[in-house]
């Protein structure tokens, strides 16, 4: 059994059982991957993948267990490399962060600028996607950190640490009837077409929850994953915008009126997540604390030692998080 074979079977699953796509991603040949997978199956005396002709159709029950363990083994191999790197070149390495557009555009720029200045020999890579894609990327080992608000609870294998609370703002054009109001009720908001985030992005679930709680149905006419796109369509008069407050800037958005929505929606919490098996390099601890100053190395280590994310939630229950 070779590590290469374990990597191949994991990557085949990551590429939805498409061996050709797997070969392209690994810069190798399709026959080479197929041969190594067969050799591993022959050695183990069991099928990892069910087949129809030359095509893989599904992972067998035994294969699912083997894939799970293979992921753990490969994660440990990565940890060994990280330990060696920490002792040899503590300020050199790589960091892969998976996050949403809102975090990348509005919450992370200052953090990343300071981090790169401090660690010029660490290559930082950012992947943007939906919260589900982000959590999955970290769960599969394709990213070190997931930073998001939605969907991280779906991945129990991630350690999830609360970073900050945030809420939404209502944005309208100056000529809109709501523009002169000091405050807006959810009943008033329900009277207008809304422009907001796609479901599953940037706290959208809280918007739906607030309307359901009030027995109302929001009239959503346009959704997008990008707050800048939403603001563009608000300017075009398509509807009332509901976006993260941090995404509205009086300097860059002087033509929009920002209305507080704290009385309508409950706050959301952005978290940073990573695999429990991840060996955190010193610069990774530093990145976490730059993003969330209350998450010191000692606090992170204490949280990682807890058994579940429910225990982590309890640990932070009485800690006042920053507001954005």
From Swiss-Prot:
| InterPro entries reported in the protein's UniProt record | LysR_subst-bd, Tscrpt_reg_HTH_LysR, WH-like_DNA-bd_sf, WH_DNA-bd_sf
Record-level Gene Ontology MF annotations: DNA-binding transcription factor activity; transcription cis-regulatory region binding
State the compartments where it is located. Answer: Cytoplasm
Q: Subunit info?
A: Homotetramer.
Offer a single GO CC term for the protein.
cytoplasm
Q: What is this protein called?
A: HTH-type transcriptional regulator CysB
Q: Which residue ranges does the Swiss-Prot or TrEMBL entry mark as DNA-binding?
A: 19-38
What keywords are annotated for this sequence in UniProt?
A: Activator, Amino-acid biosynthesis, Cysteine biosynthesis, Cytoplasm, DNA-binding, Transcription, Transcription regulation
Q: Which domain of life is it from?
A: Bacteria
All copies of the HTH lysR-type domain together span 1-59
Task: Kindly report the protein's main subcellular placement as a broad class.
Answer: cytoplasm
> Which CDD domains does the record match to this protein?
PBP2_CysB
Q: What does this protein do?
A: This protein is a positive regulator of gene expression for the cysteine regulon. The inducer for CysB is N-acetylserine. Thiosulfate and sulfide act as anti-inducers.
Record's family? Answer: Belongs to the LysR transcriptional regulatory family.
Q: Name one Pfam family in it.
A: LysR_substrate
What species is this protein from? Klebsiella pneumoniae
Classification via Gene3D superfamilies: Periplasmic binding protein-like II, Winged helix-like DNA-binding domain superfamily/Winged helix DNA-binding domain
NCBIfam families named in the record: PRK12681.1, PRK12684.1
One Gene Ontology biological process: cysteine biosynthetic process
